[in-house]
Amino acid sequence: MRSVLKACDLEDRFPILAVENNCIVSKDADITVAFEVELPELYTVTAAEYEAIHGTWVKAMKVLPNYSVVYKQDWFVKENYRSEGDGTESFLSRSYERHFNERPYLRHRCFLYLTKTTRERARRRSDFSTLCRGYILPKEITDWDSVVKFLEAVEQFEHIMNDSGHVRMKRLRTEEVVGTEECPGLIERYLTLGMEDTHPVLQDICLDPERMRIGDKRLCLHVLSDTEDLPGSVGTDMRYERLSTDRSDCRLSFAAPVGLLLSCNHVYSQYVFIDDAQEILQRMEKTSRNMLSLSKYSRSNAVNYEWAEMYLDEAHTKGLVPVRCHCNVLAWAEDEEELRRIKNDTGSQLALMGCVPHYNTIDTPVLYWSGIPGNAGDFPAEESFYTFLEQAVCLFASETNYRSSPSPFGIRMTDRQSGVPLHLDISDLPMRKGIITNRNKFILGPSGSGKSFFTNHLVRQYYEQGTHILLVDTGNSYQGLCSLIHDRTHGEDGIYITYEEDNPIAFNPFYTDSGEFDVEKRESIKTLILTLWKREDEAPRRSEEVALSGAVNAYIRRITENRDVRPDFNGFYEFVRDDYRRMIEEKKVREKDFDIDGFLNVLEPFYRGGDYDFLLNSDKELDLTNKRFIVFELDNISGNKVLLPVVTLIIMETFIAKMRRLKGIRKMILIEECWKALMSANMSEYIKYLFKTVRKYFGEAVVVTQEVDDIISSPVVKEAIINNSDCKILLDQRKYMNKFDHIQRLLGLTDKERGQILSINQANHPERFYREVWIGLGGTHSAVYATEVSDEEYAVYTTEESEKLELQKLAKELGGNLELAVKRIAEIRRERKMSNGKA
């Protein structure tokens, strides 16, 4: 005959009486205030910051009255990533979202319950749980003053935590606890073990201790309820070996192994019971005396006496607060095989903390029941152990998932732990918060580190959000993306300009739309001519600077007073040769102060009939105003020390002109390796000017380099670029680990940032193809993210010549349809990966 378990309605045993004024009131008159807690992001906290977080928890708990319970509940629930697209995205954006669709990850939410209970309730054992009896109201229910004092202490607790700058607490409203018609509340979520935003189906709760179930979910419980199960010592944090090196540390909280590092559905519960400290110590004194008197009969009594004395000595000499503590991991699965795996995984993670895994099969229902929000006062006293407040808080999980930026603008990067997309704003939101003062970016990544993939990924998303982008490249890194944009816009955008002998890049430095020459325009002209005149390592004398400035200003006066004169470099050269020569002769400027003949001789190749006469005498301007994606490819002249700096300056001046015309529109100039041509002492002021000016016009300048020696050896880089780039982006630096001290000093990196950077690509997931990247903002906010792209994006971004040629050949076979060729290539890549996986 089948045994039938006794059943009852949840309502008959439910321990919560009401939720009023945002407080949970139990049927035993316990009052609970609930909070949602925002913890720091995983892998972004240092040992010192963990100690600060620990100290804040301790300080906050000390303001709570006796017989309070601090119950921290961390939920870790498996979910699948859902695409956020609305059908209006670009081809590559859709591919990106499709690539990640349904990817599983562990979602974390942290709640904190502060409960005021009574002396009698604090001592009750599991056999006196509300699961087993009715309700007896304590006499304290009539003491309204104790309630008021508790609520005042809760407010102090909240202020202390929020003022710390590391942890944020938000008090939950009544509807968030009990739920609404549209959304389940916290209590309903706990009773169904689900974090969905829709009401779950009603389910039976089976409270069999050995096989507890909630609907189809089978539960297992591991507890830390005895000091014998704990390690000999605990700390605020621990070294995470997988992301550490012999030159850097990655730190995690002591309880991190049972947090995000435990990849299954689970709730990690941490209880701290604040009883009467004096009463606890008196009881310990009595126990100590008893152990001493019985020590002759058993050696264990003598050992217990010594432990009790040590505990009392610590409490009295250091002023430590004695408390009771309990932690447990409640995990669940929907089939027996998975449940067995989860049991083993949970036990292994507890062992990583130095704890003895204790699988509880007796008190699972009672411990689950006391975990109901507002019912912490029902916790069985025998499941807790005595310790000090400082040690108890060490068992708190202190980190959470990466968070997306609450901003409409940004880029999609990937969480390095779970591999799901994040929305990251590294420009606007940090500016509004005062984290950075400019949007400029400095990118450092050696060859093969994924630098081109990241920059392609960055500019593609900026472009799709309306940014005007101008790129100066020397390696055809953006050819695929530019071609795709060109095809999608039917030639209206995606302009790819290469320097060719029969069609060179040219412009007129003396041309302006309005005919006006402000200070900035005059300075750019002087910088250009100085670059033509002086060698890279040759700084001008003060007298030469004055003479050049006088020549430029005098010529500008001439062309502004006489509009019939066509301004160009030829006209300037002739003006200096004839008119300005007479002017300096009248001033009696000595030849050693300004050698005008030497000046003209050096500039002659750029004058009419010279080798480069086309460069600065263009009769038409590069009209880039309405083109949003332009690439200047300068690979053909990357080794020409005369042309490269001049052409790069021309392009930058063109960008500045565009920048001034487009009001209220985001602009970006990204300069790849050719920035090195601009690093002479003569150009440092102009580079500083560019980096400072773009901020005023809603723009950002981005410099990309791969050689560490370039930044170590050039003081101009530090003064002109690094100091004016509040966003620094570094890729894998392992090959420069021995040189990293120099890089750290030059970039002004903290030890925390150093540890993050050297952890890049140390523990990548073997089944995913991605490269990690470190992003630092203003020296105060930083983290490592992953650049993972879809197969379609890979086909567009790749810099491998064989892969680029394969794509171009296929596009030609398909009648020039590049998008279709990208889709075909991506499908081939997916088929290869599937076949390799099967093999």
Put a short name on every predicted segment.
Residues M1-E399:
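Extended, folded cores of ATP/NTP-driven motor/assembly subunits in large transport
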Residues C23-A29, N101-L106, T317-P322, T414-R416, ...:
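Short glycine/proline-enriched loop/turn "hinge" motifs that connect secondary-structure elements
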Residues P40, A47-V63, L262, C355, ...:
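P-loop NTPase motor domains
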Residues G85-S90, S126-L131, G374-G377, L484-T489, ...:
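Short secondary-structure boundary/capping segments
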Residues S427-R460, I469-L481, I495-N503, D635-G755, ...:
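Conserved P-loop NTPase motor cores
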Residues T750-A811:
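Conserved P-loop NTPase
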